[in-house]
Amino acid sequence: MNNVNSKIEMRKTTTIIHNYEPGDNEFIERKFSVYNKAYHRLESKGMYYDAEKKDLYLPAGIEQYYIERSFGRDIFHKVGPDKFAKVSGVKLKYTPRDEKQKEAIKFCLGMPPYEKNERASQLQVNLNTGVGKTYVAIVTFAYLSMRTMMITSSLDWIDQWREKIKEYTNLRDDEIYTISGVGSIAKLINGMKDVSKIKFFLCSHSTIKSFAKKYGWDMVSALFRRLEIGVKIYDEAHLWFDNICMIDFFTDVAKTYYLTATPIQSDFFNNRIYQTAFKTVPSIDLFDEDKDPHTSYISMLFNSHPKATDISACSNIYGFDRVKYTEYLTFQENYYKILKILMVMIEQTVSPSGKVLIYIGTNYAIMRTYYWIKYYYPHLSVGLFSSLVPKEDKTKELNNRIILTTTKSAGAALDIQGLEMTIVLNEPFKSQVLTKQTFGRTRAHNTRYIDIVDVGFSTLKHYYASKKPLFKKIATDCVEIQLSDHDINQKLLEIEREERRRLQLIQDRPNLKQVVEITQKAGEGN
């Protein structure tokens, strides 16, 4: 049982409703519920009910109006966080590179004009890709001088964070600790690891979730108290939303930062809950529509001419099936005609050292496309950045000129040096999260994002229309190219003529003509 007499207990990152019985407040329960189409039922999201203790956990970011309206004003405010360790001697090696980083750091530390943030326990840092969220987070850690835990959405990103911490500060390897696996957490809780010198902990969502599943969320609370964590930071905070809520419900640290370039959820109903959970959490977004865009958007509209049977085959009980469509398209003639046009564009407009990232929805479709490119363009290096390649070899694939991938594999936080062009060739989506994520892969100026749209499917036309307003905001310019079958064939004819012209120019060179004549005479002599 809890030691709080009040009905409502407010902590740094959660509001707990004590002595709650399911059904006591249908308004709140519905506000934090989504409909499961597969099982035809409402399921809770963004809240947690402890049936044994009869405690209902809600996000601290929910508007207090809803709490008071639903449960009254018998509120106990927990004044301080759990005990945390102070760290000293952290020195920064670099100053902020621009005004945006300076502004973001002021926001995080509660400096003018953000004085209120000094007392805020939760802050959203919604900075666009390339601004430097990593640097801002590390500077914040250094200034606050509290033991910090970074929680990443992928195990792969932990090493990146470790390297950046060492690059930006004077921390040594032995002052940064990676929590890996359930056994590692058990050792920390049981005091089998001396953490007195550790200043920065790194852990993944999957590790914490696995530990909680085995030992319970109260043990996650015990872990944070044992480590005396003062600050926790979520990287790519739009991912693992359910896990973020649970960690927030069962930890009570001084400061929590949510880093993301896309503070939204793909699903409409999930996003409604996400926005409710962070409604009162201060946020910063320094995107400047006039100065920040650096990539142009080009949409190429074509028609794969699906028959009624094709449209039916690319559907499931819920509607359009993206996986089935992706594989269907690789059997269509116009797909390879469009690919031919794109390959010529790559050869003519991408620099010799530049790279091209191509999104394709499935590994099967990737392989069909890969073999086509290798057959017709054997001189071009092509990499596979997906589950087709062993994890330890994936990074090497990014050294190729053309990289075939999926949105799942080339997700958030991926930085490809020298990327000049992104092509969404055969992976349909309407998600604003994926749109910003894929668009953010190109970091340099004068880069391009090409979106291939099959207008033969009404669903894909709807996807395209729903994303256009966002592209108008984040791109330097937007160009729409409509390609009829006649246009495609004419373009291919022009390409063929140009290839013949170049071949003729090569053959007309004097030294080459001499070699040909000698070869012909040698053949006649035999």
Give, region by region, the residue ranges found by the protein language model.
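Conserved two-lobed SF2 helicase motor
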Residues: 195-214, 397-412
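Conserved RecA-like P-loop NTPase helicase motor core
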Residues: 387-470
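Walker A/P-loop
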Residues: 116-140
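Conserved interdomain linker/interface between the two RecA-like ATPase lobes of SF2 helicase motors
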Residues: 283-356
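Conserved Walker A/P-loop ATP-binding site and its immediately adjacent core
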Residues: 143-168, 362-366
